[in-house]
Amino acid sequence: MASTVITLLIVTSLTMWTLSTTTARSRGDGRRSGGRGGERPNIVFFLADDLGFNDIGYHNPAMKTPNLDRLAAKGIKLENYYVQPVCSPTRSQLISGRYQIHTGLQHSIIWVAQPSCHPVTDPTIAQKLAEAGYATHAVGKWHLGFYRKACWPTRRGFDSFFGMLTGSANFYTHRHMGGQWNLPGSGNWSGYDLRNDLEQVGQDYQGVYSTHLFTQKSQAIIREHDQSKPLFLYHAFQTVHFPLQVPAHYYAEFGHIADEKRRVYAGMVKCMDEAVGNITATLKESGMWNNTLLIFSTDNGGNLKYGGNNWPLRGGKRSLWEGGIRAVGFVSSPLLPKSARGTVHKNLFHVTDWFPTLVKGVAKGSLRGTNIDGYDVWKLLKRSGRNTGSADWPRKEIVHNIDPYSALSSALPQRFFTTFPAAIRYDNWKLLTSQSENGSWVAPPESSEKTVHLRESPQKRVWLFNLADDPNEKHDLSLERWDVSTALLRRLGRYLRQSVPVYFPPPDRRANPALHNDSWSDWIK
């Protein structure tokens, strides 16, 4: 009876809670981080690429990540933390604090030949931190569009950029090959993709493994930093994205893993862990560590085709199942209260929350001029371990995505249909519609666990799960709890009406690197 009453209250609140643009726009200011004074900390944000939920040592001892494990053990592990299922949308939400339904990036990644990028009208986290007095530097993978120079990192608030503009490249040659699947003849396009600010430098670093190269660059930034102002360093790893490449000595100790892809992948993870350790050591050597906040996150679930693993979660990269969006993440810093160190945080946290949390809560900057979907949770996060209840936590809901894209029309539909791929989380309830991606539970090759494949009717359109009782999405309650399903479908409809149209333009042949001195570059001035 008690369970029925609780559920009824949840459904009632879902039905009665009306959404308003004003509320959405004011969220960042809704929870203020208390207190002024104190030195503004340096912020180092590590973003791993395609790292699965089961691909870090503290989730899976088969993965060797001693540096990450040590940092997480001394910090706050975020165990109810969500990102997006593919690269560009997560990066977009990180730098803007906005859902992809509000930026037009609902459908996919930004492909190399698309005249598209994160909206240049949106203030970025780098711009707001620069306003707050920070030096801002980006190293590694951008993947937020580059067809115009206005889309590039140094035009979006970063003082410097060293890295790649596209979504993938050879780790040694720094060349990206392939145009776009729907552009005939572009499959053999190839060009350098390594930039030092605006200059192409790929040919200067032939044979240098990119994880090592990016690490050295971040170390140099730290050593050369003017410590009279705080530092924001955004280090976006290329690893562990395909192609699966790493110096052999990194995977030599994983000979017991029979699956070759998984074995090399484990070596790539080990190399990334070493990089985090080296950069952290440089912060300490430079006398900056005691005033640094370090954040580690992945951008989406592990790619099941290329060695990644999300066990025991369902699905993987590209899907809205938990394996595609529930992320590895933690915060570590000597600045954390002792009571917060070594804690596990289980309140709902989304990648959009980093923007207001870091800009307003940590840097004491302003959110004026932003239109964000994230929450400033810095004050509450620091209370981790001191009985921080979910009642105090501002985030109760995540709109994972609504993708109404149709190749026939760019117009925004006037109503929600269950044929749209979508997912929404409210409290412990999660509803999904029209999921075509892998919904299996794929066991790690190094374990004795068994993969479970689920075959469902292609006509099935709605799933509902209570993640408190069923975190691995095994028991669909969509029919049994049709009251909850209906309430969440209505909410998706309301969010759809607040969305912007999907922006997914056709590819452009002017992107061909052969037209740009053998490099991927802007092609519209």
Residue ranges, per PLM feature:
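Formylglycine-dependent sulfatase
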Residues: A2-W463, P471-P506, P513-K525
